[in-house]
Amino acid sequence: GTWSGHVSGEEIHPYEMNVAPASLFGMDRLLTGHTLLASLRGVPAYYFPAVEGEPNDLEAAENEGHNRAINRPKRTIESRIEVLDDARTSSRDELIRRLALRQTISAFHPDAQQRILDLEDPLLGIVRGEEPASVTVIANLGFDATNYVVEEPAFDLLSEQLVHGEVSVAPSEILWLSTADISS
């Protein structure tokens, strides 16, 4: 990686990690991160090789003589197809499905309101939009399943399941909860 710091002897901090996100985080966490990005206010921007789940390219780093090449693939369409395995393809397809779904939900308009919920670690909670069309985003950023209490019946737009009461949220799982048009 590349490091930055001051000559005065202050602590040195990483500037860039020089690692492919899929290799560092794994495909499940990468999909969660991309989905969180789509859940936030504004217009999400994605780095194509990360969406594709490109692994570290150790050969490129060695051949080019610098670490930055590890996550900057130069591929033809044919070689890109060879690199992508089923897990990466299904993760990419799931992200595309989620982004298409996002486009249909008014709460995810780039200018829609956003409020951060005060939840216990490792849960992250965000409310997007306004009632009755708001969406509550719940993400488990930890490594163990954790429980979240859904106060009123809601529909998880991602899993297409009705949820209510105490719900177990798996590691790297993200929920898009909507109460619009839900009858108890």
Language-model features and meaning:
Residues 151-161:
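Solvent-exposed beta-hairpin/edge-strand motifs
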